[in-house]
Amino acid sequence: MADFDEIYEEEEDEERALEEQLLKYSPDPVVVRGSGHVTVFGLSNKFESEFPSSLTGKVAPEEFKASINRVNSCLKKNLPVNVRWLLCGCLCCCCTLGCSMWPVICLSKRTRRSIEKLLEWENNRLYHKLCLHWRLSKRKCETNNMMEYVILIEFLPKTPIFRPD
C-alpha cells in the first residue's frame, strides 16, 4: 500500500529514449549555400536554386525552386541598399570613428529577419506538413575561414501515430 501515491518516472525515461532514437535516425540536414557574387556580412545576394537530390520524394522540385526564388527576391530587394550603405560607411568610417557602419549592420539584421520570417511562413504553409524545417544558419565557408549564412533544410522526425498525446 506504500506504493499507492509514489510517482514513477519510467514513462518519461521511455519517452525521452524514443525521442532520442527518432533524432538519431533522421538524415543529415540539406545545406543550400549562397551562390551570388556579392556578400555583405556573410549574407550572399542569392542562394542556389538547384534541386538537391536528397530531397527527392520529399518535396516537388517546383515547390523548392519557388521557395528559393522567394528568398532570392527578398535578397534582391534588400541587398543593393545594404551595399550602397556599406560603401558609404567604409568611405566615412575614419571620420566617424566607425559610427557610419551602424546603418549597414542594422539593414543587414533587418534583411536576415525578413528572410527568417519568410522561411517561417514557408514552414507553416508547406514544409512542416512534409516533415521538413527550413532555417537560416551561420556556417563556416568551405573555401576559407570566414562565416556565411546558409539555408538548412532539416528533416523532422515523424511522431508515432500509435502513441496518444
From Swiss-Prot:
InterPro entries hit by this protein: CHIC1/2, Golgin_A_7/ERF4
Gene: CHIC2
Motif (CHIC motif (Cys-rich)): 88-106
Compartment(s): Cell membrane; Cytoplasmic vesicle
Pfam families (alphabetical): Erf4
Entry keywords, A to Z: Cell membrane, Chromosomal rearrangement, Coiled coil, Cytoplasmic vesicle, Lipoprotein, Membrane, Palmitate
Record organism: Homo sapiens (Human)
Pathological association: A chromosomal aberration involving CHIC2 is found in a form of acute myeloid leukemia (AML). Translocation t(4;12)(q12;p13) with ETV6.
Breakpoint for translocation to form CHIC2-ETV6 in AML (site feature) positions: T111, R112
Key word Metal-binding present: no
Post-translational modification: Palmitoylation in the CHIC motif is required for membrane association.
Coiled-coil ranges per UniProt: 1-26
Superkingdom to which the source organism belongs: Eukaryota
Disulfide bond annotation, renumbered to this chain: none
Protein name: Cysteine-rich hydrophobic domain-containing protein 2
Keyword Cell membrane: yes
Gene Ontology CC terms, in alphabetical order: Golgi apparatus; Golgi-associated vesicle; intracellular membrane-bounded organelle; plasma membrane
Family, similarity comment: Belongs to the CHIC family.
